[in-house]
Amino acid sequence: MKHFGLICALFLSCTLFAQQAYNIAAPYDPATVKVEEDQRGEVIKFVMNESLRYPGTEREVLVYVPQQYRDSAPACLLVCMDGILYDATTVLDNLITSGEMPVTIGVFINPGVVYDEDRNVVRYNRCKEFDSTDDNWAQFIEQEVLPQVRALKTKDGQAINISSDPNDCAITGASSGGIAAFTAAWNRPDMFSRVYTTVGTFVAMRGGHEYPAIVRKTEPKPLRIYMQDGWYDVWNPIFGEWFEYNLLMESAFNFAGYEAFHVWNRGNHSIKYGTLAFPDAMRWLWKGYPARVSKGTSNNGMLQAILDPAYDWLALPISSTIDGDIYPAAEGKIVFASGNKVCQLDADGQLQMVSTLKSGERLMGEGLSLRSNTLYKNGQKVAEGLRACLAVQELAGGKYVALCDASVKSNDIVSVLSEGTRALAVAPDYRFCVSVQENTHHLISTIMDKKGHMLYSEPFYFLHDLSNGTLATSGNVAFDMEGNLYVATPMGVQVADHNGRVRAILSLPAGGVDALAFSGQYLYVRCGQKLYVRKMKAIGHNPKQGAMSYQSQGQG
């Protein structure tokens, strides 16, 4: 009898599963019908057996060139992971012919595999390449794959001419390839504007589960995103529920104001349903082309409070090199060192040299320099004994806070902080300061009493990081007049509230931010040797202005 009951239960569960199985017939779509052979695009194959970013890997790359292509004009680009998925070449043949897609070259990249000397697989690189949330995969496409593609010739001798305009470039993938497509566009919106992800692996493999929160916090990027997933998509429950995380991603895109479309069905973790959706996904992603994909408007209250929607980042063309940090100066300007010269720059890009540095002298701020453990203000000695000094903040009344490891010989140095290892910022009300440490996601908050004593240091501010555990050191930090903290990080400028939580992230096409300065209404950032400026709604606080109160945000 027990066996009979068990058999009945199994039969019932199998029957219910069969009833839930995805069995909807797909309507006829002319884009899925193979065209005559003489109308098909050409497919060129090559093998990559060297890589700087993924050492030892070997992979096949397939390049689709449509019949309509002529090398006299740059073609659009579609990058796809895992080779030719979705019967994509047939769909491209049809959609390009019908005019529903522009002339597009397809680049289909298989994941890397490492072999031993006997051609046995030693390492499958797919998860590393596709599920990582850093910018390595995008850099690999840009610096290693596309140069080889552009070096090819078609069988009739045409060169491969691909547009570098992100508005002309799309990227797609399934499963881990789906998150790889999104990650490439997210990290490099200067490369891709259009994304199709199917059964995307936005789960806890290599950090993808953090994306929903990060999308909500980050200033919208010019991306158009089409998502497909099935209600029963669970490849491995150890890592999470695929469909649940796709729902969270769709919710985040909606909150952040993206052009995003989704198709949910009864499917599981399979390429079948992404293949059915592929023609419509391509139509939707390219709808209205060549009109540019634009940024949306986020519901993020912090972004709304600090950003002026009339202004975006502006690149400042400068011929001088930038050595080290940048510092706020009067009238919305900044200063920085360029060799032995101290240069001043305004928001219009007007550059002038204001002073020179002596041998061994280091710029520490507007008018501030350090030489032989001695601090100078406009050439006049202020304090001695600043050993291993990393940062100085000038307060009102000719007082200073220093980040160093020493007993300073000066009454003008009100506080010496040794907790940090990189940078320092004093809060607008002078009641605490923040310092940056290396190899951690936290910043140190230290209370300052009225006598200048440093008390109760604590790892208080928590930063986001998508670099997959490299723990890249953050750059310098600055406060606005409302007590919000701005931090230069590899992800962009992260803005934290009074309680140490990042609530906004400002990203740039150039990638990570090495240094920043908030001078009046203007936020300046350095990305390598590139400088950008943005006019803000928020106002930067310069400690030289004196202590200023601001409204508490409470403990919520």
Model region roles, listed by residue range:
Residues P220-L223, M448-G511:
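Glycine/small-residue-rich hydrophobic helix-like segments
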